[in-house]
Amino acid sequence: MLNEFPIFDYEDIQLIPNKCVIKSRAEADTSVTLGNHTFKLPVVPANMQTILDENVAEQLAKGGYFYIMHRFDEAGRIPFIKRMHNQGLIASISVGVKDYEYDFVRQLKTDAPEYITIDIAHGHADSVISMIQHIKKELPDTFVIAGNVGTPEAVRELENAGADATKVGIGPGKVCITKVKTGFGTGGWQLAALRWCVKAARKPIIADGGIRTHGDIAKSIRFGASMIMIGSLFAGHIESPGKTIEVDGEQFKEYYGSASQYQKGAYKNVEGKRILLPAKGHLQDTLTEMEQDLQSAISYAGGRQVADLKHVDYVIVKNSIWNGDASH
């Protein structure tokens, strides 16, 4: 039962250092393998319209990073797969569970993407299970990611249906208001939910949401994530598709949730909101900084590679590390 587990989130945890065994953090290997491909970092930008478009997806793939294209340009998905494959790049797309998506999946047989993410706010659903089974039947070589979920039962069911990885996180994101609108979710205890779900998993888990700092990436790996999906830290870059807005002479970028009225174009079943983020520099600068910070984390863990972070000890500090020092 969940009540037997300690409940905590990212800011409540500090990892405990081990003796360093490498001469320089540059020796630390941050690469991870998901399915048949290896990527430079265990992170993936959230598949949201204000985070990535086709150009950003292409930039990420060319750089050796994992990406998941959002599902909000439905007609553009097949041309996108062709565009990527024509350049020798992997194609990674998202689908929903509506009836017409079944026909869409059948159309992919001639040029199947390497990765498909079934992208639903509440992924522990019969509709998701039947879509997993459909994709696995039609495209047996495609790696299927399914989500989002927040319980071990959900992880087990989606894995048993054929999912190759599950995405854990119900509403912990910065622009997600599921917890406010519905009373449900993993907001405020996302890291504990990840730990709980990992115990049931036989396949990779993608932690999705609640990442506020680069150190949270290392913490996610410690608690069992194979890959970490990140929204707000990847939003607001020069390349980001969000609108640039000027307020009192300062540049901001628009960032909104996937179930917001801004994305839906209608105010119904809204579980996302819009915020403005100060405009950042280039996306590659953030990726490089994430890589360097993760290399430092691996060196603190006394390791040489990402998996070594899984074995460090930790302490639950309940917010004390941030007290009086919001600058971090």
Swiss-Prot record:
Gene3D superfamilies: Aldolase class I. One of its GO terms (biological process) is purine nucleotide metabolic process. Catalyzes the irreversible NADPH-dependent deamination of GMP to IMP. It functions in the conversion of nucleobase, nucleoside and nucleotide derivatives of G to A nucleotides, and in maintaining the intracellular balance of A and G nucleotides. NCBIfam families: GMP_reduct_2, PRK05458.1. It comes from the Bacteria. Keywords: NADP, Oxidoreductase. It is an enzyme of class 1 (oxidoreductase). SUPFAM superfamilies: Inosine monophosphate dehydrogenase (IMPDH) (SSF51412). This is GMP reductase. One of its GO terms (cellular component) is cytosol. Belongs to the IMPDH/GMPR family. GuaC type 2 subfamily. Its EC number is 1.7.1.7. PROSITE patterns: IMP_DH_GMP_RED. It comes from Streptococcus pneumoniae (strain JJA).
